[in-house]
Amino acid sequence: MDVLYSLAKTLKDARARIVEGTLYTNVADIVQQINQVINSINGSTFQTGGIGNLPVRNWTFDFGTLGTTLLNLDANYVENARTTIDYFIDFVDSVCIDEIVRESQRNGIAPQFDLLRQLSNAKYKRINYDNESEYIENWNLQNRRQRTGYLLHKPNILPYNNSFTLIRSQPAHDNVCGTIWLNNGSEIEIAGFDSECALNAPGNIQEFEHVVPMRRVLNNATVSLLPYAPRLTQRAVIPTADGLNTWLFNPIILRPNNVQVEFLLNGQVITNYQARYGTLAARNFDSIRISFQLVRPPNMTPAVAALFPQAAPFPNHATVGLTLKIESASCESVLSDANEPYLSIVTGLRQEYAIPVGPVFPAGMNWTELLNNYSVSREDNLQRIFTAASIRSMIIK
């Protein structure tokens, strides 16, 4: 994997810098690196493809080295160099694709494609190494079972979950109290509702709680908390728990009270915030507990009082909501996030070439299903194929 990254980095730089009219002295270093690549791989033959609909392709390397000149690079020089560079880029791209579409239940962090294993041969160690990539650095650490670390922007750590639970309900669902939530990616929306607007709750205060487990520990997270849940606080037709009927959710928005957000690690509270909105910070956690209250307004104008009558029927649902977003965090495990297209690259290639479902990943690389059972085997394989995807992304930009 190191050789593949170094190849890609060298080729990317060469493609960008070796252009017509450039002084040779300004690109002499990258020309020497390209020549080192050529000398290392010349005489080798490789084969890619042969899995799913990925076509078999044979690769033969017999290229002359790039020459030197005292003048600017002319069109002939650049055309000759580009022919070599483009062939090598196509080769690296094919190797990346082959690695991305393979998986293994055992030692999934190690290269699975025979060709990539061949590139670890001592013959290719002369290729100029450049291991500045975060993915390459972490791949090397994981390969040695040492601690890794990824800085993530809006990490996709929460499996999709949209549901509700009722604290109180009537058969006709004309007097209900409960919570409704939507968890996905890096966002949690939670709303508490009560047809009676806490009329019969102790002290006219209805309490709600929502606990969200993470699939991995997050560290040094920046989190935002806002006192509303826009996706949930709209009129909606909701199925009953048994799925045999539906009921009308008709929310009237109130502001939540006594909001408390606790970040826990192994069941212990690490960071706790009370009655605070905006930007929060959490040191490390593997679950989040959110508690809040719906307080019946002690004084109401006639228009408001008409919304929340003292007796049935109760046409509306007094509703309070919160939105929590994990804006950034570090994690020892590889995850997809808002900054990187690697999950899309991996999923797209597997669909394009009709790669059969293997022993590790769910069909279609379903992210929710993958997270719900994020095993060590899945993590190892995901780190390897995301590393290959990061290399491919670099050369096809």
UniProtKB/Swiss-Prot annotation:
Q: Which family does it belong to?
A: Belongs to the rotavirus VP6 family.
* Protein species of origin: Rotavirus A (strain RVA/Chicken/Ireland/Ch2/1979/G7P[X])
Entry protein name: Intermediate capsid protein VP6
**Residue sites binding Zn(2+) per the record:** 153
Q: How does it assemble?
A: Homotrimer. Interacts with the inner capsid protein VP2. Interacts with the outer capsid glycoprotein VP7. Interacts with the outer capsid protein VP5*.
What GO biological process term is on the record, naming one?
A: fusion of virus membrane with host plasma membrane
Identify the SUPFAM superfamilies for this entry.
Answer: A virus capsid protein alpha-helical domain (SSF48345), Viral protein domain (SSF49818)
| Record bears the keyword Metal-binding | yes
